[in-house]
From Swiss-Prot:
Cellular component GO terms held in the UniProt record: cis-Golgi network; endoplasmic reticulum; Golgi apparatus; membrane
Membrane topology: Multi-pass membrane protein
GO biological process, one term: retrograde vesicle-mediated transport, Golgi to endoplasmic reticulum
Species assigned in the record: Arabidopsis thaliana (Mouse-ear cress)
Keyword tRNA processing among UniProt keywords: no
Annotated protein name in UniProt: Protein RER1B
Subcellular location as annotated: Membrane
Residue spans crossing the bilayer: 38-55, 60-80, 114-134, 135-155
Gene name in the database record: RER1B
Amino acid sequence: MEGSGGDSGSMATPVQKKVHEAWRVYQYYLDKTTPHSTNRWIGTLVFFLIYCLRVYSIHGFYIISYGLGIYLLNLLIGFLSPLVDPELEVSDGATLPTRGSDEFKPFIRRLPEFKFWYSMTKAFCIAFLMTFFSVFDVPVFWPILLCYWVVLFVLTMRRQIAHMIKHKYIPFSIGKQKYSGRKSSANSGGGSRAD
């Protein structure tokens, strides 16, 4: 009995090793793309255009596009939302009182940029693959789906922008902020020492 159990385990081991090795290679190349955000987003834009051309050329799979749009809207909301929602923060009264202007809270996203990009790219690839199976081509009147998605997008983004204004946060930053000392006091201080 022990011999037969060991044989089945050893049969799966080479397969598991190959799968694990393939996963490591995949993860290696995925990690190499991390610092190249512009190139990653250009690649995702290419996937998006290929998907749009596919749907446009076959005039179908609108329900897949609608589901993809809802999923991308969900990802966008996660990307624009802070990790800790100020409305849900519970203060138990044990903290020291501080003024809002004195306290610095960096904006930390609920969904980081890399995971946002990765999920979005996977969604485009999966949706593209689904267009090759006719079972997913459900006949629908696409203008109704488009109107419903636009209304959903506008209402959701209005709520998100109101939340940003209410809690005074901006989810976008371009580059690293550069801080410099007060130059006027440094110049005046240097001039007073020359006596």
